Regions:
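Conserved phosphate-donor/acceptor-positioning beta-strand/loop module used by diverse small-molecule
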Residues: 110-114, 123-147
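P-loop (Walker A) phosphate-binding loop of NTP-binding proteins
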Residues: 26
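Post-Walker A helix-loop "phosphate-sensing" segment adjacent to the P-loop in P-loop NTPases
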Residues: 40-50
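ATP-dependent small-molecule kinase phosphotransfer cores
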Residues: 49, 53-109, 113-115
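Small-molecule kinase domains that catalyze NTP-dependent phosphoryl transfer to phosphate-bearing small molecules
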Residues: 146-198
């Protein structure tokens, strides 16, 4: 099971006034593709930040993560460098503490996280929006098989995991079964607080 740790709230309460936009969903849903397109669309907006996750697995061309060893991750955690950290599929993941400064400055921070940290982050931050990105099971299976990433492990096992929890906790759900450009525009509207339906 996943281990999660979230940083304590500010002395005055939950960290704000900026927004924390959390993207969750099953492997193969296209989260990283939509995030990459959304980041490109928001690149000229200084009020929107896409922090790089710290991860204890090899870097991937599809993700903009900071790859570190398990020892480096442990040392950073012990030095309080993470706003939140979690374990999933045999790897450690974290978001840097810098996101707290961005949130306090009123910026929107957008991050791909595990659904296991949602409750802790909703408690620690004043303005949280959870976006669940999903796709039909056959599409998920095709995408996982096509990317053939060793860290994906057993595809059937991944697909058998329930994604209902993430959708139930989501403020917005994007069914990513069509054009990535179309769905990334939906995500950008959510990030900017404009709603998402066309």
């Amino acid at each position: 099971m996943s281990e999660t740790t979230a940083m304590a709230r500010d002395e005055a309460g939950a960290i704000g006034p900026g927004r924390l936009v959390l993207v969750v969903g099953p492997s193969g849903a296209g989260k990283d593709t939509l995030l990459r397109l959304a980041q490109a669309a928001c690149r000229d907006d200084p009020g929107i930040v896409f922090p790089r996750r710290i991860v204890t697995r090899a870097a991937s061309a599809d993700e903009d993560n900071v790859a570190v060893s398990s020892d480096e991750f442990r040392r950073a955690r012990e030095h309080g460098e993470f706003a939140v950290q979690w374990e999933a599929h045999g790897h450690s993941y974290a978001l840097p503490c810098d996101i707290n400064d961005d949130i306090r400055a009123g910026r929107a921070v957008v991050a791909n996280v595990s659904r296991t940290v949602l409750a802790a982050l909703r408690h620690a931050y004043a303005n949280v929006v959870v976006v669940a990105i999903t796709a039909p099971p056959d599409v998920l299976a095709q995408r996982l098989a096509a990317r053939a990433r060793q860290s994906d492990g057993n595809i059937a096992e991944r697909l058998s995991r329930s994604v209902d929890d993430a959708s139930a906790q989501a403020d917005v759900t994007i069914l990513n079964a069509g054009s990535a450009e179309y769905h990334s525009r939906q995500l950008v509207r959510v990030i900017k607080g404009e709603g998402w339906q066309e």
